[in-house]
Amino acid sequence: MNQNSIRIKIKLAHNPYEVVIKKNGLARIGEELKKIGFKKATKVLVVTNKDVSVHYGKEFIHNLSDNGFNPTLIEIKAGEERKNLATISDIHNAAYTSRLERGSLMIALGGGVIGDMTGFAAATWLRGVSFVQVPTTLLAMVDASVGGKTGVNHPKGKNLIGAFHQPKLVLIDPITLKTLPEREFKAGMAEVIKYGVISDKKLFRKLEDAPRLDKLETLTDRFLLEIIQRSVQTKAHIVELDEREGGIRAVLNYGHTFGHAIEALCGYGTWLHGEAVSMGMIAIGQLALERNIWNISDLERQRKVLCQAGLPTIWPRVCAEDVIEILKSDKKVKDGEINFIVPTEIGKVEIIKNFTVNEIKQALQKLASK
Protein backbone atom coordinates (compact mmCIF):
# COMPACT_ATOMS: atom_id res chain seq x y z
CA MET A 1 0.00 0.00 0.00
CA ASN A 2 1.33 3.41 -0.99
CA GLN A 3 1.46 5.28 2.30
CA ASN A 4 1.37 8.70 0.61
CA SER A 5 -1.48 8.39 -1.89
CA ILE A 6 -4.40 5.99 -2.38
CA ARG A 7 -6.96 6.38 -5.16
CA ILE A 8 -10.31 4.62 -5.03
CA LYS A 9 -12.60 4.85 -8.06
CA ILE A 10 -16.34 5.23 -7.52
CA LYS A 11 -17.62 3.54 -10.68
CA LEU A 12 -21.04 5.08 -11.26
CA ALA A 13 -22.73 4.96 -14.67
CA HIS A 14 -23.25 8.71 -15.02
CA ASN A 15 -21.16 10.38 -12.31
CA PRO A 16 -17.90 8.45 -11.73
CA TYR A 17 -15.28 10.07 -9.52
CA GLU A 18 -12.29 9.30 -7.33
CA VAL A 19 -11.67 9.31 -3.62
CA VAL A 20 -8.07 10.40 -3.14
CA ILE A 21 -6.46 9.67 0.24
CA LYS A 22 -3.30 11.74 0.26
CA LYS A 23 -1.00 12.86 3.05
CA ASN A 24 -0.73 16.67 2.87
CA GLY A 25 -3.46 16.55 0.23
CA LEU A 26 -4.87 19.93 1.23
CA ALA A 27 -1.73 21.53 -0.18
CA ARG A 28 -2.47 19.84 -3.54
CA ILE A 29 -6.12 20.81 -3.97
CA GLY A 30 -5.43 23.07 -6.98
CA GLU A 31 -3.52 20.36 -8.81
CA GLU A 32 -6.23 17.77 -8.11
CA LEU A 33 -8.92 20.09 -9.50
CA LYS A 34 -6.93 20.61 -12.69
CA LYS A 35 -6.58 16.83 -13.09
CA ILE A 36 -10.36 16.46 -13.26
CA GLY A 37 -10.80 19.26 -15.77
CA PHE A 38 -11.44 22.46 -13.84
CA LYS A 39 -9.88 25.41 -15.63
CA LYS A 40 -8.06 28.46 -14.35
CA ALA A 41 -10.28 31.41 -13.36
CA THR A 42 -13.08 29.03 -12.27
CA LYS A 43 -15.03 30.64 -9.44
CA VAL A 44 -14.86 28.51 -6.30
CA LEU A 45 -16.93 28.93 -3.14
CA VAL A 46 -15.26 27.19 -0.19
CA VAL A 47 -17.72 26.43 2.61
CA THR A 48 -16.23 25.74 6.02
CA ASN A 49 -16.60 26.62 9.69
CA LYS A 50 -14.50 28.73 12.03
CA ASP A 51 -12.68 25.84 13.73
CA VAL A 52 -11.54 24.33 10.42
CA SER A 53 -10.80 27.71 8.86
CA VAL A 54 -8.43 28.65 11.68
CA HIS A 55 -6.24 25.63 10.90
CA TYR A 56 -6.56 25.23 7.14
CA GLY A 57 -8.56 28.05 5.54
CA LYS A 58 -5.78 30.48 4.62
CA GLU A 59 -3.45 27.83 3.13
CA PHE A 60 -6.35 26.25 1.25
CA ILE A 61 -7.43 29.53 -0.36
CA HIS A 62 -3.83 30.45 -1.20
CA ASN A 63 -3.34 27.13 -2.96
CA LEU A 64 -6.46 27.64 -5.05
CA SER A 65 -5.35 31.19 -5.96
CA ASP A 66 -1.81 30.07 -6.76
CA ASN A 67 -3.27 27.53 -9.19
CA GLY A 68 -5.26 30.20 -11.00
CA PHE A 69 -8.69 29.68 -9.44
CA ASN A 70 -10.93 32.48 -8.17
CA PRO A 71 -11.86 31.42 -4.61
CA THR A 72 -14.14 32.87 -1.95
CA LEU A 73 -14.41 31.42 1.55
CA ILE A 74 -17.53 31.48 3.70
CA GLU A 75 -17.57 30.40 7.35
CA ILE A 76 -20.88 29.02 8.60
CA LYS A 77 -21.88 27.79 12.03
CA ALA A 78 -21.78 24.01 11.91
CA GLY A 79 -23.42 21.38 14.11
CA GLU A 80 -26.60 19.34 13.65
CA GLU A 81 -28.68 22.13 15.20
CA ARG A 82 -27.57 24.44 12.34
CA LYS A 83 -28.16 21.88 9.60
CA ASN A 84 -31.29 23.52 8.23
CA LEU A 85 -32.70 25.56 5.36
CA ALA A 86 -31.71 28.84 7.02
CA THR A 87 -28.03 27.89 6.74
CA ILE A 88 -28.56 26.76 3.13
CA SER A 89 -29.91 30.25 2.45
CA ASP A 90 -26.67 31.71 3.87
CA ILE A 91 -24.64 29.56 1.46
CA HIS A 92 -26.89 30.55 -1.45
CA ASN A 93 -26.43 34.22 -0.53
CA ALA A 94 -22.66 33.74 -0.65
CA ALA A 95 -23.00 31.99 -4.02
CA TYR A 96 -24.98 34.97 -5.32
CA THR A 97 -22.48 37.51 -3.96
CA SER A 98 -19.61 35.52 -5.49
CA ARG A 99 -21.47 35.38 -8.83
CA LEU A 100 -21.22 31.61 -9.07
CA GLU A 101 -22.16 30.32 -12.52
CA ARG A 102 -23.13 26.90 -13.85
CA GLY A 103 -19.46 26.12 -14.47
CA SER A 104 -18.42 27.22 -10.99
CA LEU A 105 -17.59 24.97 -8.05
CA MET A 106 -18.43 24.64 -4.37
CA ILE A 107 -15.99 22.91 -2.02
CA ALA A 108 -16.99 21.48 1.36
CA LEU A 109 -14.03 21.86 3.73
CA GLY A 110 -15.07 20.32 7.02
CA GLY A 111 -17.04 17.52 8.62
CA GLY A 112 -20.18 15.68 7.67
CA VAL A 113 -22.56 18.56 8.38
CA ILE A 114 -20.52 20.93 6.21
CA GLY A 115 -20.42 18.32 3.45
CA ASP A 116 -24.15 17.57 3.59
CA MET A 117 -25.10 21.25 3.48
CA THR A 118 -22.58 22.27 0.82
CA GLY A 119 -23.67 19.39 -1.39
CA PHE A 120 -27.33 20.34 -1.02
CA ALA A 121 -26.57 24.02 -1.66
CA ALA A 122 -24.66 23.00 -4.81
CA ALA A 123 -27.49 20.71 -5.94
CA THR A 124 -30.03 23.52 -5.63
CA TRP A 125 -28.03 26.55 -6.85
CA LEU A 126 -28.74 27.26 -10.53
CA ARG A 127 -30.37 23.79 -10.61
CA GLY A 128 -27.03 22.20 -9.86
CA VAL A 129 -23.37 23.21 -9.79
CA SER A 130 -20.36 20.96 -9.22
CA PHE A 131 -18.97 20.36 -5.77
CA VAL A 132 -15.98 18.69 -4.17
CA GLN A 133 -15.72 17.07 -0.75
CA VAL A 134 -12.65 17.75 1.41
CA PRO A 135 -13.58 16.02 4.68
CA THR A 136 -11.67 16.92 7.84
CA THR A 137 -13.31 14.52 10.33
CA LEU A 138 -13.06 10.74 10.49
CA LEU A 139 -16.83 10.38 10.14
CA ALA A 140 -16.90 12.49 6.99
CA MET A 141 -13.87 10.71 5.54
CA VAL A 142 -15.28 7.21 5.83
CA ASP A 143 -18.96 7.90 5.36
CA ALA A 144 -20.59 11.29 4.72
CA SER A 145 -18.30 12.47 1.92
CA VAL A 146 -18.81 9.41 -0.30
CA GLY A 147 -22.01 8.50 -2.11
CA GLY A 148 -23.73 11.75 -3.02
CA LYS A 149 -26.28 12.03 -0.23
CA THR A 150 -26.83 15.70 0.62
CA GLY A 151 -29.42 17.44 2.72
CA VAL A 152 -30.59 19.13 5.89
CA ASN A 153 -32.77 18.33 8.87
CA HIS A 154 -36.45 19.14 9.31
CA PRO A 155 -37.95 19.81 12.77
CA LYS A 156 -39.76 16.46 12.43
CA GLY A 157 -36.73 14.39 11.49
CA LYS A 158 -33.13 14.10 10.36
CA ASN A 159 -32.17 14.55 6.69
CA LEU A 160 -35.80 14.66 5.53
CA ILE A 161 -34.92 17.43 3.04
CA GLY A 162 -32.21 16.53 0.53
CA ALA A 163 -31.02 15.40 -2.86
CA PHE A 164 -28.61 12.94 -4.43
CA HIS A 165 -25.74 15.01 -5.85
CA GLN A 166 -22.43 13.24 -6.44
CA PRO A 167 -19.18 15.15 -5.85
CA LYS A 168 -16.61 15.50 -8.63
CA LEU A 169 -13.85 14.50 -6.22
CA VAL A 170 -13.33 13.49 -2.60
CA LEU A 171 -9.93 14.53 -1.23
CA ILE A 172 -9.02 13.01 2.14
CA ASP A 173 -5.99 14.32 4.02
CA PRO A 174 -5.49 12.29 7.23
CA ILE A 175 -3.30 15.09 8.61
CA THR A 176 -6.49 17.03 9.43
CA LEU A 177 -7.38 14.44 12.07
CA LYS A 178 -4.56 15.83 14.23
CA THR A 179 -6.66 18.94 14.96
CA LEU A 180 -9.91 17.03 15.42
CA PRO A 181 -11.36 17.09 18.97
CA GLU A 182 -11.17 13.69 20.66
CA ARG A 183 -14.95 13.39 20.96
CA GLU A 184 -15.34 13.93 17.20
CA PHE A 185 -12.68 11.32 16.47
CA LYS A 186 -14.46 8.74 18.61
CA ALA A 187 -17.78 9.57 16.92
CA GLY A 188 -16.21 8.87 13.53
CA MET A 189 -14.99 5.49 14.72
CA ALA A 190 -18.65 4.41 15.06
CA GLU A 191 -18.98 4.48 11.27
CA VAL A 192 -15.78 2.46 10.85
CA ILE A 193 -17.11 -0.17 13.25
CA LYS A 194 -20.39 -0.15 11.31
CA TYR A 195 -18.57 -1.24 8.13
CA GLY A 196 -17.01 -4.12 10.02
CA VAL A 197 -20.39 -5.31 11.28
CA ILE A 198 -22.26 -5.02 7.98
CA SER A 199 -19.67 -6.29 5.52
CA ASP A 200 -16.01 -6.59 6.50
CA LYS A 201 -15.08 -9.29 9.04
CA LYS A 202 -11.37 -8.61 8.58
CA LEU A 203 -11.84 -4.94 9.43
CA PHE A 204 -13.88 -5.86 12.50
CA ARG A 205 -11.19 -8.25 13.74
CA LYS A 206 -8.54 -5.59 13.15
CA LEU A 207 -10.54 -3.17 15.29
CA GLU A 208 -11.06 -5.84 17.97
CA ASP A 209 -7.33 -6.51 18.14
CA ALA A 210 -6.45 -2.84 18.74
CA PRO A 211 -5.92 -2.17 22.48
CA ARG A 212 -7.89 1.07 22.18
CA LEU A 213 -9.58 3.06 19.44
CA ASP A 214 -10.52 6.25 21.25
CA LYS A 215 -7.33 8.26 20.79
CA LEU A 216 -5.65 9.16 17.50
CA GLU A 217 -2.18 9.13 19.03
CA THR A 218 -2.47 5.43 19.98
CA LEU A 219 -2.97 4.41 16.33
CA THR A 220 -0.20 4.06 13.77
CA ASP A 221 -0.43 5.93 10.46
CA ARG A 222 -0.60 2.57 8.68
CA PHE A 223 -3.51 1.38 10.83
CA LEU A 224 -5.37 4.65 10.29
CA LEU A 225 -4.86 4.60 6.53
CA GLU A 226 -6.00 0.99 6.32
CA ILE A 227 -9.24 1.49 8.26
CA ILE A 228 -10.07 4.61 6.21
CA GLN A 229 -9.29 2.79 2.96
CA ARG A 230 -11.28 -0.35 3.85
CA SER A 231 -14.25 1.75 4.99
CA VAL A 232 -14.28 3.81 1.80
CA GLN A 233 -13.91 0.68 -0.35
CA THR A 234 -16.88 -0.95 1.39
CA LYS A 235 -19.05 2.11 0.88
CA ALA A 236 -17.85 2.55 -2.72
CA HIS A 237 -18.79 -1.03 -3.59
CA ILE A 238 -22.29 -0.68 -2.13
CA VAL A 239 -22.90 2.74 -3.74
CA GLU A 240 -21.81 1.36 -7.12
CA LEU A 241 -24.46 -1.36 -6.80
CA ASP A 242 -27.20 1.02 -5.69
CA GLU A 243 -26.51 4.73 -6.22
CA ARG A 244 -29.93 6.01 -5.13
CA GLU A 245 -30.73 3.68 -2.24
CA GLY A 246 -33.34 1.62 -4.03
CA GLY A 247 -32.21 -1.59 -2.35
CA ILE A 248 -28.86 -2.85 -1.01
CA ARG A 249 -27.51 0.63 -0.17
CA ALA A 250 -29.92 0.73 2.76
CA VAL A 251 -27.49 -1.54 4.68
CA LEU A 252 -25.26 1.52 5.13
CA ASN A 253 -27.93 2.80 7.51
CA TYR A 254 -27.13 0.12 10.08
CA GLY A 255 -27.61 1.72 13.50
CA HIS A 256 -28.96 4.90 11.93
CA THR A 257 -32.70 4.24 12.25
CA PHE A 258 -32.62 4.24 16.05
CA GLY A 259 -29.70 6.69 16.02
CA HIS A 260 -31.69 9.32 14.13
CA ALA A 261 -34.54 8.91 16.64
CA ILE A 262 -32.13 9.57 19.52
CA GLU A 263 -30.82 12.72 17.82
CA ALA A 264 -34.32 14.05 17.19
CA LEU A 265 -35.70 13.26 20.66
CA CYS A 266 -32.70 14.45 22.65
CA GLY A 267 -32.27 17.59 20.54
CA TYR A 268 -29.82 17.98 17.65
CA GLY A 269 -26.38 18.67 19.05
CA THR A 270 -26.91 16.82 22.35
CA TRP A 271 -25.32 13.71 20.86
CA LEU A 272 -22.87 13.68 17.99
CA HIS A 273 -24.09 11.67 15.00
CA GLY A 274 -21.57 8.87 15.56
CA GLU A 275 -22.51 8.64 19.24
CA ALA A 276 -26.18 8.26 18.30
CA VAL A 277 -25.27 5.62 15.70
CA SER A 278 -23.36 3.70 18.39
CA MET A 279 -26.45 3.58 20.60
CA GLY A 280 -28.53 2.74 17.53
CA MET A 281 -26.27 -0.25 16.84
CA ILE A 282 -26.80 -1.42 20.41
CA ALA A 283 -30.59 -1.07 19.99
CA ILE A 284 -30.87 -2.96 16.72
CA GLY A 285 -28.51 -5.60 18.11
CA GLN A 286 -30.89 -6.11 21.04
CA LEU A 287 -33.87 -6.30 18.68
CA ALA A 288 -32.07 -8.92 16.59
CA LEU A 289 -31.21 -10.88 19.73
CA GLU A 290 -34.85 -10.86 20.88
CA ARG A 291 -35.90 -12.26 17.48
CA ASN A 292 -33.13 -14.94 17.68
CA ILE A 293 -31.57 -13.59 14.49
CA TRP A 294 -28.28 -12.71 16.19
CA ASN A 295 -26.38 -14.46 18.95
CA ILE A 296 -25.34 -12.98 22.26
CA SER A 297 -21.65 -13.59 21.54
CA ASP A 298 -21.65 -11.30 18.48
CA LEU A 299 -23.79 -8.75 20.33
CA GLU A 300 -21.14 -8.63 23.05
CA ARG A 301 -18.30 -8.39 20.51
CA GLN A 302 -19.99 -5.37 18.97
CA ARG A 303 -20.50 -3.76 22.39
CA LYS A 304 -16.85 -4.29 23.36
CA VAL A 305 -15.50 -2.69 20.18
CA LEU A 306 -17.79 0.30 20.66
CA CYS A 307 -16.47 0.58 24.22
CA GLN A 308 -12.87 0.38 22.95
CA ALA A 309 -13.69 3.43 20.85
CA GLY A 310 -15.04 5.27 23.90
CA LEU A 311 -18.55 5.37 22.42
CA PRO A 312 -21.81 5.37 24.40
CA THR A 313 -23.48 1.97 24.69
CA ILE A 314 -26.15 2.78 27.30
CA TRP A 315 -29.59 3.53 25.88
CA PRO A 316 -30.64 7.10 26.82
CA ARG A 317 -33.75 7.94 28.83
CA VAL A 318 -36.25 8.37 26.01
CA CYS A 319 -39.83 7.13 25.83
CA ALA A 320 -40.25 4.01 23.67
CA GLU A 321 -43.53 5.35 22.23
CA ASP A 322 -41.80 8.57 21.17
CA VAL A 323 -39.03 6.56 19.49
CA ILE A 324 -41.61 4.58 17.52
CA GLU A 325 -43.34 7.78 16.36
CA ILE A 326 -40.00 9.09 15.04
CA LEU A 327 -39.30 5.75 13.36
CA LYS A 328 -42.56 6.01 11.42
CA SER A 329 -41.30 9.15 9.64
CA ASP A 330 -37.87 7.68 8.86
CA LYS A 331 -36.72 7.82 5.21
CA LYS A 332 -36.46 4.02 5.15
CA VAL A 333 -40.20 3.53 5.73
CA LYS A 334 -41.71 1.80 2.70
CA ASP A 335 -45.43 1.12 2.26
CA GLY A 336 -45.92 2.06 5.91
CA GLU A 337 -43.37 -0.49 7.19
CA ILE A 338 -40.04 0.33 8.81
CA ASN A 339 -37.06 -1.28 7.10
CA PHE A 340 -34.54 -2.28 9.77
CA ILE A 341 -30.96 -3.21 8.93
CA VAL A 342 -30.46 -6.23 11.17
CA PRO A 343 -27.20 -8.07 11.95
CA THR A 344 -27.20 -11.84 11.53
CA GLU A 345 -23.47 -12.34 12.16
CA ILE A 346 -20.35 -10.15 12.21
CA GLY A 347 -19.87 -9.07 8.60
CA LYS A 348 -23.44 -9.72 7.50
CA VAL A 349 -26.77 -7.91 7.80
CA GLU A 350 -30.24 -8.28 6.32
CA ILE A 351 -33.09 -5.85 5.62
CA ILE A 352 -36.10 -6.92 7.69
CA LYS A 353 -39.38 -5.04 7.89
CA ASN A 354 -41.85 -7.20 9.81
CA PHE A 355 -40.95 -6.21 13.36
CA THR A 356 -44.06 -5.43 15.41
CA VAL A 357 -44.48 -2.35 17.59
CA ASN A 358 -44.53 -4.70 20.59
CA GLU A 359 -41.17 -6.24 19.66
CA ILE A 360 -39.60 -2.80 19.32
CA LYS A 361 -41.05 -1.65 22.66
CA GLN A 362 -39.85 -4.77 24.47
CA ALA A 363 -36.31 -4.43 23.11
CA LEU A 364 -36.13 -0.74 24.08
CA GLN A 365 -37.56 -1.40 27.53
CA LYS A 366 -34.99 -4.14 28.09
CA LEU A 367 -32.22 -1.71 27.09
CA ALA A 368 -33.62 0.98 29.39
CA SER A 369 -33.53 -1.43 32.34
CA LYS A 370 -29.83 -2.25 31.93
Swiss-Prot record:
**What is the reaction catalyzed?**
7-phospho-2-dehydro-3-deoxy-D-arabino-heptonate = 3-dehydroquinate + phosphate
Q: Which domain of life is it from?
A: Bacteria
Q: How is the cofactor bound?
A: Binds 1 divalent metal cation per subunit. Can use either Co(2+) or Zn(2+).
Per UniProt, what is one GO molecular function of this protein?
A: 3-dehydroquinate synthase activity
Q: Which GO terms describe its biological process?
A: amino acid biosynthetic process; aromatic amino acid family biosynthetic process; chorismate biosynthetic process
Pathway(s): Metabolic intermediate biosynthesis; chorismate biosynthesis; chorismate from D-erythrose 4-phosphate and phosphoenolpyruvate: step 2/7
Report the GO terms under cellular component: cytoplasm
Q: What InterPro entries does the annotation carry?
A: Dehydroquinate_synthase, DHQ_synth_AroB, DHQ_synth_fam, DHQS/DOIS_N, DHQS_C
What Enzyme Commission number(s) appear in the record? 4.2.3.4
Instruction: State the UniProt keywords alphabetically.
Output: Amino-acid biosynthesis, Aromatic amino acid biosynthesis, Cobalt, Cytoplasm, Lyase, Metal-binding, NAD, Nucleotide-binding, Zinc
Q: Any idea which positions bind NAD(+)?
A: 112-116, 136-137, 149, 158, 176-179
Instruction: Mark the transmembrane ranges.
Output: none
Q: Which cofactor does it need?
A: Co(2+); Zn(2+); NAD(+)
- Localization, UniProt: Cytoplasm
Q: Which residues take part in binding Zn(2+)?
A: 191, 256, 273
The top EC class, named as a word, is lyase
Q: Which Gene3D superfamilies match?
A: 3.40.50.1970, Dehydroquinate synthase-like - alpha domain
Function recorded in the entry: Catalyzes the conversion of 3-deoxy-D-arabino-heptulosonate 7-phosphate (DAHP) to dehydroquinate (DHQ).
Q: Give the similarity note.
A: Belongs to the sugar phosphate cyclases superfamily. Dehydroquinate synthase family.
What protein name applies here?
3-dehydroquinate synthase
Specify the species: Prochlorococcus marinus (strain MIT 9211)
Q: Which gene encodes it?
A: aroB
